[in-house]
A protein has these predicted regions:
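Catalytic strand-loop segment that frames the active site of acyl-thioester-processing enzymes
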Residues: 1-35
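Generic structural detector for well-ordered beta-strands
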Residues: 12-18, 69, 111-115
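Flexible, active-site-adjacent loop/turn segments at secondary-structure boundaries
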Residues: 19-23, 31-32, 53, 60, ...
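HotDog/MaoC-like acyl-thioester-processing domains
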Residues: 75-76, 86-141
Length: 141
């Protein structure tokens, strides 16, 4: 990681809640609100934006942990801001506190951890996972 990455670095992601961000099970939308999984995705994205500018050319980040407490709903059409802040750097790990806001209303909070690896190490890990999948067959048997 570049020395420019510090505790306190931040990034924000802004989005308009759309119907494709609503919770749906078996293709049926159950609520016209921002889903927990959409919030989790946007929290990952904001945390990635904290890390990405500070990666060396030979490095890549990989997610290791995400916790989300979904505290309040946001309706379709609402503007949501996800804020990520680096709160801990420990060797090759970055921990971000992530929060989701609609105006002054706290919608959610959590933590996201990314590990920074050399790209060739990550490629070996992914290749090993692909081989496991090929050995089992794509249907998991």
């Amino acid at each position: 990681m570049k020395p420019s990455l510090h505790v306190g670095n931040t990034a924000d992601v802004h989005m308009l809640v759309t119907e494709d961000m609503c919770p749906a099970f078996d293709g049926i939308v159950v609520h016209q609100v921002y889903s927990t999984w959409s919030m989790a995705h946007h929290m990952e994205l904001a945390a990635r934006k904290v890390l990405a500018p500070h990666l060396e050319e030979h490095e890549e980040g990989i997610g290791g942990h995400l916790s989300v407490d979904h505290l309040a709903p946001a309706a379709v059409g609402a503007t949501v801001r996800i804020h990520a802040e680096a709160i801990e750097l420990n060797g090759d790990q970055l921990t971000c506190e992530v929060t989701a806001w609609e105006g002054a209303t706290l919608l959610g909070r959590g933590q996201q951890v990314q590990r920074v690896l050399p790209k060739e190490v990550l490629k070996r890990i992914i290749d090993r996972a692909a081989r496991r999948s090929d050995e089992k067959g794509r249907d998991g048997t």
